[in-house]
Design a protein with these regions (language model features):
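Glycan-recognition and catalytic regions of carbohydrate-active enzymes
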Residues: 160-221
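Conserved small/polar residues in nucleotide/adenosyl-binding loops
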Residues: 248-255
Length: 258
């Protein structure tokens, strides 16, 4: 049996403007009802496969077991600065979602720098030259520590009472944690680390602007994890331990390759 199944009509892989013409299709709840009859032992995940913008425009009347949306930072701005600023939007997105979904549990994913779907055009932009590019099917920073920095910042910003599941990457391909030859990308280690946090207590701890942190309590031991999403070194203080730390930046490629 399937544990969970995400229901999203194919037509809604496209974007529709609030004041524009919408497709003549059954209400989303009709799809959910049918899915629940067929997959009676599975949790039904409502929402969109695309970004939160599309979910906000097409809000289901009922949300069932979970509500889902994906997240990518390169819709409008693919620069390092633009991408590293997107984690700031997550708390506002989740607050809005909580208000109109009656605090339904949340799944966020897929989460990646490169896009999985382009609801605003016929297809994704091919990025064979591996440059910074809006609406691209892949992104060169996925192979760098930059992707680890950004993904961890998204995870930390997403932690709240409603957020229950995250889908970060695939195994192989443009968004994979492994290369074709099975060598490990930086995100492989992040995924393994997050899996290791099962049964731990996690607390958000953001000591200064552009630094996101976690305090982790596991087996009566405390761990601190910080990510610097700025382009400068940052000094932070952990009052509980009475120590200061200097956080360096990721190894993002130079902007000249854009």
């Amino acid at each position: 049996n399937l544990d969970k199944i995400l229901i999203c009509p194919k037509i809604y892989l496209n974007s529709f403007q609030p004041a524009g013409e919408w497709p003549k299709a059954p209400e989303l709840n009709e799809y959910y009802k049918i899915a629940k009859k067929i997959f009676s032992n599975s949790e039904i995940v409502s929402g969109m496969v695309t970004n939160f913008t599309e979910l906000n425009r097409k809000r289901p009347k009922m949300f069932y077991d979970l509500v889902s949306f994906s997240f990518t930072p390169i819709v409008h701005d693919s620069s390092d600065f633009g991408v590293l600023n997107t984690p700031e939007t997550i708390p506002y997105i989740l607050k809005t979602l909580k208000n109109f979904s009656n605090s339904t549990k949340v799944h966020i994913g897929p989460i990646s720098i490169g896009m999985h779907f382009n609801p605003y055009g016929e297809s994704l932009v091919s990025n064979k030259n591996k440059i910074r590019l809006e609406m691209a099917d892949s992104d060169p920073r996925h192979d760098q520590l930059f992707s680890l920095t950004w993904t961890l910042a998204i995870f930390i910003q997403s932690i709240n009472k409603e957020s229950k599941f995250f889908t970060f990457n695939s195994i192989y391909g443009h968004h994979g944690i492994l290369n074709k030859d099975n060598t490990k990308r930086p995100l492989y280690h992040l995924n393994n680390f997050l899996i290791s946090l099962t049964n731990s207590e996690i607390f958000k701890f953001n000591p200064v602007n552009e630094v996101y942190g976690l305090k982790i309590v596991l087996n009566d031991k405390k761990y601190y994890l910080f990510v610097n999403s700025s382009k400068q070194k940052k000094e932070i203080i952990i009052p509980e331990l009475n120590i200061s730390c200097l956080l360096y930046t990721s190894d993002a490629a130079d902007e000249s390759d854009r």
